[in-house]
Amino acid sequence: MSKKNYYLLSEGILKRKENTIYFVNEKGSKPLPINKIYSMYAYGQITISSQVISLFAKEGIPIHFFNYYGYYNGSFYPRESLLSGDLLIKQAEHNIDFSKRLKLAKLFVEGAAKNILKVLAYYKIENNIKNTLTELNESSKITEVMNVEGRIRAEYYQYFDDILPDEFKMEGRSRQPPTNMINSLISFGNSMMYASVITELYNTQLNPTISYLHEPAERRFSLALDLSEIFKPIIVDRVIFYLVNKKMITEKDFNQDLNCCLLNDKGRATFVKEYNKRLETTIKHKDLGRKVSYQRLIRLEAYKLKKHVFGMKEYDPFVIWW
């Protein structure tokens, strides 16, 4: 029986009866068999019993929590059953050794930029991002690498106006909170991407708090931020372009006031459905010679990083080939 991601988009209570979880809300009680749950995303006020937490811990199921704005709040991260002291030491070594960290940081930006270029090529948009990317060669500090990444993404966001209809104009990137519809979609999607990467990292032996491009910090899984950069263009952004251009998401799917713009319940449900559909979409892997889902690609990326820090094979960031 294949497992899948579950998304709780309304207020409710998670209860346990034997080995079945029930989500109870104003619409009734819905059974969620534990052997079908891969991970869970919870939006809104969710009450969870200790019995549910115990079962999720036993089965190794992470739960990701998001706030009113759709921002990631935190995760229930089950006790790690795949701990590796050797890997932890190697991960830390590649952060502490500046030359090793700088190399990985540049590779994450290179992978993200090349996927951005693939997206822009799909929409036949000429750009100067490739020229900006060459500046990585001269970058000798992590802050300089981050600066290159920031300028690439800023230029990339300018081209959103060429892909999307006028009512979804970017007008600059705004985050907390987003001030217009396109910024709302980007923030919502990026939060989902971050949580998806956390899930995949949980299923490897990698420590999610040791990162290379982003600074390791308290209260965040910074390695998930590193890996998210590679997949945001080909998962989150493509979902946004599809939903908006197909008019599956319109102005009616947002709550707007003077201070912020947020997806309403209907808009969130539409986005989540398409995002999950994208994660489950399979493509034929040119190296493996078989079909893999986008969700699996994230896990494979983590495995590649693991091989790199062990010195088994140089890390080569994933770049879409279509």
UniProtKB/Swiss-Prot annotation:
Disulfide bonds: none annotated. It comes from the Archaea. The keyword Iron-sulfur does not apply. The keyword Ubl conjugation does not apply. Mn(2+) binds at residues 149, 214, 229. GO terms for biological process: defense response to virus; maintenance of CRISPR repeat elements. GO terms for molecular function: DNA binding; DNA endonuclease activity; metal ion binding. Keywords: Antiviral defense, DNA-binding, Endonuclease, Hydrolase, Magnesium, Manganese, Metal-binding, Nuclease. CDD domains: Cas1_I-B. Its cofactor is Mg(2+); Mn(2+). Pfam families: Cas_Cas1. Belongs to the CRISPR-associated endonuclease Cas1 family. CRISPR (clustered regularly interspaced short palindromic repeat), is an adaptive immune system that provides protection against mobile genetic elements (viruses, transposable elements and conjugative plasmids). CRISPR clusters contain spacers, sequences complementary to antecedent mobile elements, and target invading nucleic acids. CRISPR clusters are transcribed and processed into CRISPR RNA (crRNA). Acts as a dsDNA endonuclease. Involved in the integration of spacer DNA into the CRISPR cassette. Homodimer, forms a heterotetramer with a Cas2 homodimer. This is CRISPR-associated protein Cas1 1. It comes from Methanobrevibacter ruminantium (strain ATCC 35063 / DSM 1093 / JCM 13430 / OCM 146 / M1) (Methanobacterium ruminantium).
